[in-house]
């Protein structure tokens, strides 16, 4: 009988939770894991993620006589391109569309005249107007660098020229570009 009491006592002790004997509670927490798996064919060259195209000073006289400024060249370059996932890439330019000039982006200004009097247009190296929201011709990916070359210019509206209301003073505009891999 003594043996059965000892066995019962040992069994009861073994069945008790280890937390019963702990002096303090064990504190824990949760973990969350997240991320994004991407399939980019290239890396944007440092400095080309956010471009600043500076027209410097544009003469209102030139806009009245020529209707547009001299073009400013710029490029968006990609490096570390691989054909493992994609074979080509296009680029799409976009921005707040000008209200009266198709394929021009609108400007904001703090000058003395209406900022709607001018807009900014993009061209390729052959001076062909680039349509906003339309992908460029595809460029083949290689193991080197891919470069998209553009030009931008400021153009005055015909009504601003006729009414002598071209914006004078500082102006700015925002545009975006999107890379589309195929």
UniProtKB/Swiss-Prot annotation:
Would the keyword Signal be found if you checked this record's keyword annotation?
Answer: yes
Primary subcellular site in the record, as a coarse category: other
- Domain of life of the organism in this record? Bacteria
The organism encoding this protein is Proteus mirabilis (strain HI4320)
User: In the UniProt record, which is one GO cellular component term?
Assistant: pilus
Q: What Gene Ontology biological process does one annotation of this record name?
A: cell adhesion involved in single-species biofilm formation
Q: Which family does it belong to?
A: Belongs to the fimbrial protein family.
The UniProt keywords, alphabetically, are: Fimbrium, Signal
N-terminal signal peptide: 1-22
Name the InterPro entries for this protein.
Adhesion_dom_fimbrial (IPR000259), Adhesion_dom_fimbrial_sf (IPR036937), Adhesion_dom_sf (IPR008966), Bact_Fimbrial_Adh_Pro (IPR050263)
Pfam families documented for this protein: Fimbrial
Is Signal tagged as a keyword?
A: yes
User: What is the name attached to this protein's record?
Assistant: Putative minor fimbrial subunit PmfF
List localization entries.
Fimbrium
